């Protein structure tokens, strides 16, 4: 089955793909794509079920990957935010001819907390799932607030996220539920050692969804990767510290 996803392409140079997170769409990358298009050929996608791809649906990371493969550039730098980080990591693991370098942003190989592993408490994810069935617009708004919490520019961050989501068709509830299931169940920790391309992990020090301790734990699980912590950011460093964020990507691309 072919699944035509919505892509926007701008700029010239090395191919760079930007992948959004849960409940969002490609419009969250608008400022980032604009800034990076002076340095790269930037590809921004709406994942299946989101934005202008809202009529599509994918129930697993591999189904998302198959949809992306239809139009994704080969040998590109992949930048995945939050849930998009799982998507980009999956691409690097299973479709490596498409990925020359991997960047994860405020992401984790396992989002749900378990034992000593830090993350989102399973009951929070369960509550989100229950709320989603009742009122998915309100649930997305709560998630936006949760993402920005702790950031000095939280109010502005939420405003931009909200504008981005509302500027395109609302996500489909089926895909939102599938995404929450991925956040609750996917665990790529043991697979990280098999990533064969250079990897950069970017974090926000104030992030409540991907705690800073995850960055330290991953130094052991992915010792070959590089990591950088944005001091003033929560879950959306590409908004809170936009200039520094783009600088990290440009420097990593040229290394």
Swiss-Prot record:
- The entry's keywords: Biotin biosynthesis, Cytoplasm, Hydrolase, Serine esterase
A Gene Ontology cellular-component term: cytoplasm
Active-site residue list: 82 (nucleophile), 207, 235
Record-linked Gene3D superfamilies: alpha/beta hydrolase (3.40.50.1820)
Chain sites annotated for binding substrate: 22, 82-83, 143-147, 235
The answer to whether keyword Kinase applies is no
Subunit note = Monomer.
Q: Give the chief site where it resides.
A: cytoplasm
The compartments listed are: Cytoplasm
Q: Which GO terms describe its biological process?
A: biotin biosynthetic process
Q: Where is the AB hydrolase-1 domain?
A: 16-241
Its family remark reads: Belongs to the AB hydrolase superfamily. Carboxylesterase BioH family.
The species is: Vibrio cholerae serotype O1 (strain ATCC 39315 / El Tor Inaba N16961)
Specify the protein name.
Answer: Pimeloyl-[acyl-carrier protein] methyl ester esterase
Which pathway does UniProt place it in?
A: Cofactor biosynthesis; biotin biosynthesis
Q: What does this protein do?
A: The physiological role of BioH is to remove the methyl group introduced by BioC when the pimeloyl moiety is complete. It allows to synthesize pimeloyl-ACP via the fatty acid synthetic pathway through the hydrolysis of the ester bonds of pimeloyl-ACP esters.
The gene designation is bioH
